[in-house]
């Protein structure tokens, strides 16, 4: 997968990167009481959409907050709906001796592998139902499994790095956490972009 290195630093090439990441960190702080979550998710969906079309910069502006809130809230609900069957599977497996920890890994990996498809498809169309196109999702997963595994590993790495913000107390955590999310959603878009560029079927609406 190309541009892995870019995911660490592309955001810092935006002329207003500090201001945009600082605002994102502020919304992350509000996310501690849930209020900021839709705004953060709405912004990240824009990043994924841009990346899926091969566009890195500029980072989306923090404008049209109403639109960001609505799309982010819908995406949050989508995540909850997906978590229900995954949670049921978890509780079925967790009571089987010796494989409880495997259940946790299985659930986490399963959701991580399908999330790029869900995020980009919803970000492109804004259609709630498009996030539940299971046949398209399965085809995308089979055709892009290698890159999806890379993104999964990279997302773990970014979240580990984000916690180094603890060294700078709470504000540092929020700043590095938002940076990590920008990097992860950038990679979500890149998976789709590279698949479409090389002719691999994605079933992700091209809008």
Where are these regions (language model features)?
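Alpha-helical hydrophobic membrane-insertion segments
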Residues: 91-95, 102, 153, 157
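Interfacial aromatic "cap" segments that immediately flank transmembrane helices
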Residues: 2-30, 62-88, 114-164, 192, ...
